[in-house]
Every structure is written in structure tokens, then in C-alpha cells.
A protein has these predicted regions:
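Bacterial Sec-dependent N-terminal signal peptides
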Residues: 1-25, 227
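Conserved HGGG/HGGXW glycine-rich cap/lid loop of the alpha/beta-hydrolase fold
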Residues: 33-80
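Conserved loop-alpha-helix segment in the C-terminal half of the alpha/beta-hydrolase fold
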Residues: 227-270
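Active-site loop/oxyanion-hole signature of alpha/beta-hydrolase fold enzymes
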Residues: 69-107, 111, 276
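Catalytic histidine-centered segment of alpha/beta-hydrolase-like enzymes
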Residues: 267-279, 283
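Flexible "cap/lid" loop of the alpha/beta hydrolase fold
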Residues: 121, 129-165
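Conserved alpha/beta-hydrolase catalytic His-Asp/Glu region
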Residues: 163-219
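Short glycine-enriched nucleophile-adjacent loop
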Residues: 113-124, 130
Length: 292
């Protein structure tokens, strides 16, 4: 699952390391563009996505917040890294970055939402509140409620094999088909497809494999800070909705049942990229979350 713009302000580009990269052989785990001033908001995009997915969000928040917009290594044209496991590397270096710049609101979409949860689990003193955009503690259990980290091993290995063996034409077609289930507007599909095709395929496979096989459903009980969760109500395949709004709400409640202080809101008509599919609902709901 996945997940080109320029603001008038010139962004500050920093790496996901505390040292000057020229003095450190380790490649940065991410780049960051910083906009505005105020309390920090850390914005993490999803799989194979650019930080540009937060363009509209930054425009609305930069007068009140200092927006730290990440693009993860290997995605949307950013140089990949060799450090593994990929997701644990991202979590550690994101935590180091937040620790260096001050606790704040951590907001993530898709894979970024998963990382936001994982950061709060590891050290919720870094997180004043979490805003999760269409992400779940255990992705595999959405389709297979009885799934465990062990039982999804075969599916994970099959996914890795299939994606690795595709040629570029097959991969583009597969990504376009997948994105069409996640975004309604063709122009936005093409934007996300461009990010995906600029991404390093090995990084996509490694990140997706880790996401499929990491279950945070029990661990989220450790989170004591407020967590606000937006979920897409339009989960479709071949143009047909798979779940009603009520069923989507139930799925989210089940996945997040061990999280004590939470608010779950369903964007009834939006697909996975909620900020693209229903921006009015997204920004209205986001403002409510920020004001609480």
C-alpha cells in the first residue's frame, strides 16, 4: 500500500542525523523541510510518498505551528539507505530528531501513521498528541482478523517475491492499479504514481514487509498521550465498497481497542489518501483535533 509542490517560503533542509552528513559516512534516514513558527508538528508521509502530500496541511498550519515535513530515505527520489531493519531505523532516527527539536504533535499517514504510533509506544514523552491518518496497528488483520506475525510470513514472502520480479512496466501498472483504490482523482493518482516510480523498489519491499509483519495492537496500551485517528470510509475494490461506514468504524475500534485515550473519526467518502480525497473533511477534522 502507498502512500510536487513549492511553497513561497524557502524550506530549511536538514538530515535525519544530529551530525553534519559531511562528517558522517552514514546516509540520512530522511530529509526534512521546516516551515512556519510555533509549536512543532512532525509530519510523516506514507509508503513511497513524498512529504509533499502534506502541502495543504502546511499551508493551513504554518502561521501557528512549526511544520517539520519528512520524506523518508528511498522514497520519492530520496537516496536509499542500507541500514536494516528499515522501519526500526526510521523509528530510531525520527525519535532522535524529535528529541533534538522538542516534543510536539506527531502526525503520520499510512506507514507514517504506523511509525507515529511506534514512536509513542517507545517514548510518549516525545509526543504531545498523535494524529494518525488511515493507519492501523496491524495491517494484516484488516483482511484476516485472526492473523498473527507468524501466520503472515508466507504472504509477506510472496509479496516480496512478486514485487522484486516485476519489470518496470509491470511495476508501474501494479502501482497505478493500487493507487486507483486509494485515490479518486486522476490528477492526484498521477502525482502519487510519480512519487512511487521515483522510489527505490527494494526500500518499498523492505518497508512493506516490515509493516505487514509488525503487530502493535497490544503495545499501543503503553501510549498515555491523546491519539486522534482518521480512517478512510471508502475501502473499495473494482469500484465496489468492501465495508459500510459502520463496519469500518468497527474495524478501527477493534484494532485500537487497547489504546485508552483515543478519538476515531471516519471519512465516509474518502479513500486512503484522505487529505486528497476529501480535503474539506480532513482539514475540518484536523482543526478539531488540534483544538482539543
Amino acid at each position: 500500500m502507498l502512500f510536487l509542490w513549492m511553497l513561497i517560503a524557502i524550506p530549511l533542509i536538514v538530515s535525519g542525523q544530529t551530525q553534519d552528513p559531511s562528517k558522517n559516512q552514514k546516509k540520512p534516514a530522511f530529509t526534512v523541510e521546516v516551515y512556519g513558527s510555533g509549536a512543532p508538528v512532525y509530519m510523516i508521509p506514507g509508503l513511497a510518498s513524498s512529504g509533499d502530500v502534506w502541502q495543504g496541511t502546511v499551508e493551513r498550519l504554518k502561521d501557528r505551528y512549526e511544520c517539520h515535513v519528512f520524506t523518508l530515505a528511498g522514497f520519492a527520489g530520496k537516496e536509499p539507505i542500507s541500514r536494516t531493519p528499515y522501519l526500526k531505523t526510521m523509528r530510531k532516527e525520527l525519535m532522535d530528531y524529535i528529541d533534538a527539536h522538542g516534543s510536539g504533535i506527531v502526525m503520520g499517514h499510512s506507514l507514517g501513521g504506523f511509525l507515529s504510533l511506534w514512536i509513542a509506544i517507545a517514548n510518549d514523552s516525545l509526543v504531545e498528541k498523535s494524529i494518525i491518518v488511515d493507519s492501523y496497528p496491524f495491517l494484516a488483520a484488516l483482511r484476516q482478523p485472526g492473523a498473527t506475525e507468524e501466520t503472515v510470513q508466507f504472504s509477506r514472502e510472496r509479496m516480496i517475491q512478486q514485487m522484486t520480479q516485476m519489470d518496470s512496466v509491470q511495476f508501474r501498472r501494479q502501482q497505478k492499479n493500487t493507487l486507483s483504490t486509494m485515490i479518486s482523482d486522476e490528477q492526484n493518482i498521477q502525482k502519487a504514481l510519480k512519487w512511487s516510480m521515483m522510489s527505490d523498489r527494494a526500500t518499498i519491499v523492505n518497508a512493506m514487509g516490515g509493516l505487514m509483519q509488525t503487530d502493535l495492537r497490544d503495545e499501543i496500551s503503553k501510549i498515555q498521550t491523546p491519539t486522534y485517528i482518521m480512517v478512510a470510509g471508502n475501502i473499495s475494490m473494482n469500484g465496489q465498497r468492501l465495508y459500510s461506514t459502520k463496519q469500518v468504524q468497527q474495524l478501527a475500534q477493534e484494532q485500537y481497542k487497547n489504546l485508552s485515550e483515543k478519538t476515531i473519526s471516519v471519512a465516509e467518502d474518502a479513500k486512503h489518501f484522505i487529505m486528497m480525497d476529501d480535503p474539506q473533511w480532513f482539514y475540518q477534522t484536523l482543526e478539531q483535533y488540534l483544538d482539543e
